[in-house]
Amino acid sequence: MYLFLALIIIALHILLLFYFGYTLIAVFRGAPPIPSLSSTVKRMMRLAEIKPGEALIDLGSGDGRILLAASKLGAQCLGIEINPLLVWYTRIRACLSKASSVSVRRTNLWKVDVSQADVVTIYMVPIFMQKLKEKLQAEMKPGSRIIAAVHPFPDWPPTAQEDNVFLYRIPH
């Protein structure tokens, strides 16, 4: 019995170390995993004006709440997340929610091709917003939309804004 409890405690410690290790990586490569408030997610979905069948990519998808909200609107959703624990957590949530249009890939967001996305959602720390703006403007098709939570892009006025959520459109 004591051996079993000791093994559980050791396993929990390993999982915590694993999680915090990937959190540190995320901090230095984009943003720490901070879940968006449900009110922010609702504003993001309103501004995105998602139509059934559109492709949404969430860069830094965390626990998948944006993916699940967009899938309810009919979007085909792809989450990009570097933390494997959050990838599996999102996959489990999607399965339990019967959200078959949600998939998640464990990879670095800077390596992802976003050219097929109709909508990209982000919640990124300010120091990476300029680099991300350049990537999205270079790769996304004209007319596609970007929804940024909390931090706007520098030197790019949003098309629309609702509180701390910003809508950008790739020009035609």
What is the role of each PLM region?
Residues 90-91:
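Conserved SAM-binding loop
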Residues 115-131:
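A short SAM/SAH-binding and catalytic strip from SAM-dependent methyltransferases
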Residues 127-172:
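C-terminal substrate-binding/active-site "lid" region of AdoMet-derived donor-dependent transferases
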